[in-house]
């Protein structure tokens, strides 16, 4: 029996210019390289931690 992994869509809505270097690196780690870029990611604890670190720069939507 396989459990279906929850997914989230993250969209970059804020610029990393003038932010701490770690925040820019976190955006790159999430696969976001420019404004309004979106990615669908698995909602693992690691991914959710990264999202929490830069939540002020992202729009997050839960997918079914």
Swiss-Prot record:
Pfam families linked to this entry: Ribosomal_L30 (PF00327)
Ranges for region Disordered: 1-22
SUPFAM superfamilies named in the record: Ribosomal protein L30p/L7e (SSF55129)
UniProt cross-references to InterPro entries, sorted A to Z: Ribo_uL30_ferredoxin-like_sf, Ribosomal_uL30_bac-type, Ribosomal_uL30_ferredoxin-like
Bilayer-spanning residue ranges: none
Record's keyword terms, sorted: Ribonucleoprotein, Ribosomal protein
Keyword Oxidoreductase: no
Protein family (similarity comment): Belongs to the universal ribosomal protein uL30 family.
Protein name, per record: Large ribosomal subunit protein uL30
Classification lineage: Bacteria, Pseudomonadati, Pseudomonadota, Alphaproteobacteria, Acetobacterales
Gene of this entry: rpmD
């Amino acid at each position: 029996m396989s459990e279906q992994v929850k997914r989230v869509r993250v969209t970059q809505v804020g610029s990393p210019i003038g932010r701490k270097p770690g925040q820019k690196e976190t955006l790159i780690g999430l696969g976001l390289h420019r404004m309004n870029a979106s990615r669908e990611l698995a909602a693992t604890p690691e991914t959710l931690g990264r999202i929490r670190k830069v939540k002020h720069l992202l729009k997050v939507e839960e997918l079914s």
